[in-house]
């Protein structure tokens, strides 16, 4: 089915207000969920909303909590999220990293006691739109086996890197081949994964998203490399925020909350003039996209460049929502 942006935001707002969320908070949160969905990221927009409400109802998310600054060391700050709403808090933290970068050239905010930030790419994009390089990542509950194991002991720990090119170039990736949200998107669409995404119950690689969702044997990106990167990202976020590690979140909390996150902004224009920056970025992009194609029917893509097209399509033709997901939201 198709809905307009206003219909989608209104549905989110209604549910949030029914939970006695303050009007301005409900409006801002609904806006972020709707913008994420409008950009084509269903997995962390509309599809994730019922799960968000479940955590809100369970008390994992404290909607009226206010993040508090704990430590300030010039370009580096440490904050406690107080388990406030994840996407609103993350937006505020990247804004703060940008403010620090405007003063120091680079700004880093380490956040503890946070909730799921939904679409991590929103915060990298937020920085890049203002001309900054944006880098951020989060840890999570243990939902992925480390390389060589059957049991989940590491997080998917998504990493975002956004560059202020024209258009914005951005990598937004979990440390697994596919996020659990993308497994759901493919399962709901009745599709196999395009490449192996995990192991089946017999230990064989599989492209079946439903199987991986059930047994949680999701495949690390790049096999042992993604496993290793997940581990060190967790360590850095834990140490800089003085927050909870994947192990602590998993063993001490009843669900995925109280996670640790990092937000970095770099004001590149302090290091290079605008004309030179643009020329260098364009040369990089042209060098890549003019390579001989392996398949004439498949374009060479740069990461993040598809989002402008997806956004335009949603605004022209409406936002596609899975019927079963829409029914869940209407029932909340």
From Swiss-Prot:
Signal peptide (from-to): none
One Pfam entry name: Ldh_2
Repeat listed as a keyword: no
Catalysed reaction, written as an equation: 3-dehydro-L-gulonate + NAD(+) = 2,3-dioxo-L-gulonate + NADH + H(+); 3-dehydro-L-gulonate + NADP(+) = 2,3-dioxo-L-gulonate + NADPH + H(+)
Active site: 44 (proton donor)
Keyword field: Cytoplasm, NAD, Oxidoreductase
GO molecular function, one term: 3-dehydro-L-gulonate 2-dehydrogenase activity
A Gene Ontology cellular-component term: cytoplasm
E.C. designation(s): 1.1.1.130
InterPro entries tied to this protein: Diketo_gul_Rdtase, Mal/L-sulf/L-lact_DH-like_ah, Mal/L-sulf/L-lact_DH-like_NADP, Mal/L-sulfo/L-lacto_DH-like_sf, Malate/L-lactate_DH-like
Binding site for NAD(+): 168-174, 224-225, 304-306
Subcellular location, principal: cytoplasm
Subcellular location: Cytoplasm
Family: Belongs to the LDH2/MDH2 oxidoreductase family. DlgD subfamily.
Function: Catalyzes the reduction of 2,3-diketo-L-gulonate in the presence of NADH, to form 3-keto-L-gulonate.
Database matches in PANTHER family: 2,3-DIKETO-L-GULONATE REDUCTASE, OXIDOREDUCTASE-RELATED
Quaternary state and interactors: Homodimer.
The protein's name: 2,3-diketo-L-gulonate reductase
Organism: Salmonella typhi
């Amino acid at each position: 089915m198709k809905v307009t942006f206003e219909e989608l935001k209104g549905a989110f707002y209604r549910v949030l207000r029914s939970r006695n969320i303050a009007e301005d908070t409900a409006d801002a949160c609904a806006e972020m969920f709707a913008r994420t969905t409008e950009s084509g990221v269903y997995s962390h927009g509309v599809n994730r909303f019922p799960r968000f409400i479940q955590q809100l109802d369970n008390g994992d998310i404290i909607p009226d909590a206010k993040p508090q600054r704990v430590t300030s060391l010039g370009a580096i700050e440490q904050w406690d999220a107080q388990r406030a709403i994840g996407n609103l808090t993350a937006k505020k933290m990247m804004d703060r990293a940008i403010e620090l970068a405007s003063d120091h050239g680079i700004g880093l905010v380490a956040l503890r006691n946070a909730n799921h930030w939904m679409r991590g790419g929103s915060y990298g994009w937020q920085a890049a739109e203002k001309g900054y390089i944006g880098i951020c990542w989060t840890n999570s509950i243990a939902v992925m086996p480390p390389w060589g194991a059957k049991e989940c002991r590491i997080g998917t720990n998504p990493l975002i890197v956004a560059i202020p090119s024209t258009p914005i170039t951005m990598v937004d990736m979990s440390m697994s081949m596919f996020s659990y949200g993308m497994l759901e998107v493919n399962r709901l669409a009745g599709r196999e994964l395009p490449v192996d995404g995990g192991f089946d119950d017999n230990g064989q690689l599989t492209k079946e998203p439903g199987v991986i969702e059930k047994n949680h044997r999701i495949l690390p990106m790049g096999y042992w490399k993604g496993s290793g990167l997940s581990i060190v990202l967790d360590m850095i976020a834990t140490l800089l925020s003085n927050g909870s590690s994947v192990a602590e979140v998993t063993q001490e909390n009843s669900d995925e909350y109280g996670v640790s996150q990092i937000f970095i902004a770099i004001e590149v224009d302090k290091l290079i003039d605008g004309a030179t920056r643009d020329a260098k970025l364009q040369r990089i992009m042209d060098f890549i996209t003019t390579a001989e194609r392996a398949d004439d029917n498949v374009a060479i893509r740069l990461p993040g460049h598809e989002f402008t097209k997806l956004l335009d399509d949603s605004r022209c033709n409406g936002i596609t929502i899975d019927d079963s997901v829409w029914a869940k939201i209407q029932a909340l």
